[in-house]
Amino acid sequence: MFPISETSPVQFRPPLPDLCDTVVIGGGVIGVMTAWHLAKAGQTVVLCEKGRIAGEQSSRNWGWVRQQGRDPAELPIAMEANRIWQDLAKECGEDLGFRQTGVLYLANKAGDMAGFENWLQFAKAHQLDTKLLSKAEVSAMLPSARADWPGGMITPSDGRAE
């Protein structure tokens, strides 16, 4: 089970060092990863957060680790972030709540499929595992759904993190 929750006490571990190379302000996902990589590079880092590390805004962003639907210029960065998330739990020896569950976009109308087909060319150019789903495939995937979607797009390597 992921070790951080609303019941986990906010802790401060004094004393702060007299000197450090870098102070990172903000203990959300960006601040934590910045501090982590700077420390791995040999810098002495102090991470400051007003409340709970990884328990403020980062805990409410839906947690998507998503490549699908990204701007083509962002896609290589999103793919690298996905790779980092896959390796991070092993590297730090903790369950970070990352689950590779895939991300599914559903078409509300037939015209939405054209947009999905457009984006698929970028996914293919980067060897991403995105694929289009027919109406029948979506219905089989979501048999209890009340809506009748004309199709969808899924990237199985996408996921979520807590």
Predicted regions and their residues:
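N-terminal Rossmann-fold NAD(P) dinucleotide-binding loop
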Residues: 31-32
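Residue-level detector of anion-binding/catalytic polar loops
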Residues: 19, 44, 129
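Extreme N-terminal leader/targeting segments of oxidoreductases
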Residues: 1-22, 37-41
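Glycine-rich FAD pyrophosphate-binding loop
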Residues: 39-59
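A short small-residue
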Residues: 5, 9, 59-68
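Helical element adjacent to the flavin cofactor pocket in flavoenzyme catalytic cores
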Residues: 153-162
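Dinucleotide-binding Rossmann-like beta1-alpha1 core, especially the glycine-rich loop
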Residues: 62-144, 150
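Glycine-rich Rossmann-fold phosphate-binding loop(s) that bind the pyrophosphate
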Residues: 26-28, 50
